[in-house]
Every structure is written in C-alpha cells, then in structure tokens.
Amino acid sequence: MNNNNSFNFIDSQYSTPQGAYYDNTGRMGGGGGMGGPTDSFDNELPLLEELGINFDHIRSKTLSVLNPLKKIDSHIMDDTDLGGPILFGLLLGFSLLMSGKIQFGYIYGLGLIGCVSMYIVLNLMSEKGIDIYRVISVLGYCLLPMIFLSFTSLIININGMVGYILIGFAIVWSTYSASKMFVKVLSMIDQRILVAYPVGLLYTGFALITAF
C-alpha cells in the first residue's frame, strides 16, 4: 500500500502540468491564457531595431541624397538614424586610408565642429527647432558625394582641372542635398541660401581633406 502511494506521488511530480503540452520541438507550452517565456521572446524587437539601425530608412535616405532633384518627404527625418552617418564616416576614412591619408581625426573633428555649429545656427534661424541627432543624420548622409570623390581619387589624380571640377561638383551636390533636407524638415524654404552657406563651408572642408 505504501509503495503504491510513493509511485503516485512521483508520477504527480513529473507529469505534464494541467493545460500544458509539448510541441514538435520538445518544448513545453501552456494551454491557458497566461503567456509563457516564449511569448515574451516572440514579442521582442529585433536587435538592429533596438540599436536604432533600420536598413529601410538607410536605403530611403541614401536614395534621397543620390537623387537630390526628387521631392523629399517632410517626415524623412522623423526618426533619429545614426547608423547611416556612422557607416558613411567610416567609408570616407577607409577610402582616404587606401590613398595613404590617415585622416580619421580630421574627419571626426571637422564633423563634430560642423554638426554643433549647424545645430546652433538652425535653432537660431528656425521656429520649430531641431535636435543635434537629426543634424548629424542629415550631414552624415550627405557625405555620400565626398565618398564618391575620395574613391575617384584612387583612380585618377584630382589635383588638376578635371579634379577641381569634380571637387566643386561634390561640394555643390552635398550642399544642395543637405540644405534641401533642412529647409524641408524645418519649413525654411525662404531661407535656403542662408542655410546652404554654412553647409557649403562644412563640405568644402571635407573636400579639402579628401583632395589634399
């Protein structure tokens, strides 16, 4: 009699809980309304989204820079995306490194001064205001023409007439794209020239680092 009670006790300890089941992977799931640990994992955001890296946003903003004549959505900078600017900054430094120029310090130093300066200028000029992260995002994405210029310098010598034309084109391209984004986001259409002037000075500095 005691042996039967012992076996019943052991069986109750190791049996499947009421309302539970085992799926085809061998994991136990609950049959009730309470969500188990697997439910919390399923509801978690992907790691890249938690880090603020969204490849769809990077692609759309990159295409906006590549085609500056295309109409820009006023909500393009609603999200604070720094993944693209960091990537483009590293690409610019890598391309300069391939040409024998170790300019990472100059790139990030000029970028820091330029972003802080533009943040101050834009907040003084606009009624809406803008945060520093969106300034970094816009200026970082618009580095793309400078990256093209830097990789072009690996193929041809840009310290000549053709090179000067390419340098001027890259500066105008970057300045046009960045100023267009700023005035669209901040509703400053009438002040575009005033916005483009400091932006152009910043990208001229990047072009000089790239060329010399």
UniProtKB/Swiss-Prot annotation:
A single GO BP annotation from the record? protein transport
Q: Where in the cell is it found?
A: Endoplasmic reticulum membrane; Golgi apparatus, cis-Golgi network membrane
Membrane-topology annotation of the record: Multi-pass membrane protein
Key words of the record: Endoplasmic reticulum, ER-Golgi transport, Golgi apparatus, Membrane, Protein transport, Transmembrane, Transmembrane helix, Transport
The residues on the Cytoplasmic side of the membrane are 1-79, 123-128, 187-191
> Transmembrane ranges?
80-100, 102-122, 129-149, 164-186, 192-212
Identify the GO cellular component terms for this protein. Answer: endoplasmic reticulum membrane; trans-Golgi network
Quick one: where is this thing mainly located?
endoplasmic reticulum
Q: Highest taxon of the source?
A: Eukaryota
UniProt lists the family membership as follows: Belongs to the YIP1 family.
Function of the molecule: Plays a role in transport between endoplasmic reticulum and Golgi.
What's the name of the protein?
Protein YIPF5 homolog
Q: Which organism is it from?
A: Dictyostelium discoideum (Social amoeba)
Gene name for this UniProt entry: yipf5
